[in-house]
Amino acid sequence: MVNIGVVGATGQGRQVMRNLLEQRNFPATSVRFFASPRSEGKKLTFRGQEIEVENAETADPSGLDIALFSAGATMSRVQAPRFAEAGVIVVDNSSAFRKDPDVPLVVSEVNFDRDVRGKKLAKGIIANPNCTTMAAMPVLKPLHEEAGLQRLIVSSYQAVSGSGIAGVEELAGQARPVIDGVEQLVHDGSALQYPAPNKYVAPIAFNIVPLAGNYVDDGSGETDEDQKLRNESRKILGIPELLVSGTCVRVPVFSGHSLSINAEFSQPISVERTKELLSAAAGVKLVDVPTPLAAAGIDDCLVGRIRQDPGVPDGRGLALFVSGDNLRKGAALNTIQIAELLAADL
């Protein structure tokens, strides 16, 4: 049994984390909740008990074994090292440490054994990947081990909940006022007057926005979401030379990120062998047609529409489609699964 802390215990994804800790019967002797000063003193119910939220900036983390951080990069950069210095193993769900070469970036089914188990953590911190990257990793791992992954071309279809409450409110707020006249869009894309967009660069209701994230000021024309796909895939899969081209798109879906993936390998790999491997892969469910609705609320990433890529010679290419719950496996679940693996070794 372990003593666990949840930092950033209030909010959208944090509720999912608390629910999962209960549902999975996490082996905790005690649980402490931490948040920003404005949430200090609030009461949260966990396992039938009311627990008072502590101030993450001033609380003493001594006595904790593991802390699950889901409070955003700004707080993580300051507080995660402070918790780690107190001897707490930190599993951080923000972007703060993903690029740090001394911090393992982990998907529980993919690289915990390689990068964490039996290793000394240089900074006492483990990073959780971006929710979009997360959906693809359990699918790509067994395929890479079988045939040697060389290149990925990916288009994402990212739910508005990936932008937080603001994204959810923007989609709902734009859809409600125009829903009765939506058929007019068949003939005239300017027929409806949407509320002005705030979160996105264009209306998201009944539309797509091929700009998820923010432009990176490096002349590449890429967004930070595009680059996360590349950088995180390389680090998690352990393929520093992996070629990755990504276009991340925001779509009018409330929950569930999806990816269209074209993968090129060094060796031939058949559709039949691919399905055999994925049927046995941890964290993966093989289906005919994955959708974000079907992925909502389940632990596994859904994969389907698997076919040979005719653009890659010698049977070395695959095309497939993946959907995953961005608030479940894409965030809270992976964090908890890492903590479960850590707890088993304590």
Curated annotation (Swiss-Prot):
Metabolic or biological pathway, per its Swiss-Prot or TrEMBL entry:
Amino-acid biosynthesis; L-lysine biosynthesis via DAP pathway; (S)-tetrahydrodipicolinate from L-aspartate: step 2/4; Amino-acid biosynthesis; L-methionine biosynthesis via de novo pathway; L-homoserine from L-aspartate: step 2/3; Amino-acid biosynthesis; L-threonine biosynthesis; L-threonine from L-aspartate: step 2/5
- Record field: transmembrane: none
Tell me the GO BP annotations in alphabetical order.
Answer: 'de novo' L-methionine biosynthetic process; diaminopimelate biosynthetic process; isoleucine biosynthetic process; lysine biosynthetic process via diaminopimelate; threonine biosynthetic process
Indicate yes or no for the key word Transcription. no
Q: What EC number(s) is this enzyme filed under?
A: 1.2.1.11
CDD domains xref list: ASADH_C_bac_euk_like, VcASADH2_like_N
The residues the record assigns to binding substrate are 158, 250
Report the superkingdom from the record.
Answer: Bacteria
At the top of the EC hierarchy, this enzyme's class is oxidoreductase
Q: Which reaction does it catalyse?
A: L-aspartate 4-semialdehyde + phosphate + NADP(+) = 4-phospho-L-aspartate + NADPH + H(+)
UniProt keyword Transport, yes or no: no
Give the binding site residues for NADP(+).
Answer: 10-13, 38-39, 161-162, 326
Q: Which InterPro entries match?
A: Asp-semialdehyde_DH_CS, Asp_semialdehyde_DH, Asp_semialdehyde_DH_beta, NAD(P)-bd_dom_sf, Semialdehyde_DH_NAD-bd, Semialdhyde_DH_dimer_dom
Gene Ontology molecular function: aspartate-semialdehyde dehydrogenase activity; NAD binding; NADP binding; protein dimerization activity
Enumerate the active-site residues: 131, 257
Q: Locate the residues binding phosphate.
A: 98, 228
How does this protein assemble? Homodimer.
Q: What does this protein do?
A: Catalyzes the NADPH-dependent formation of L-aspartate-semialdehyde (L-ASA) by the reductive dephosphorylation of L-aspartyl-4-phosphate.
Question: Which named protein is this?
Answer: Aspartate-semialdehyde dehydrogenase
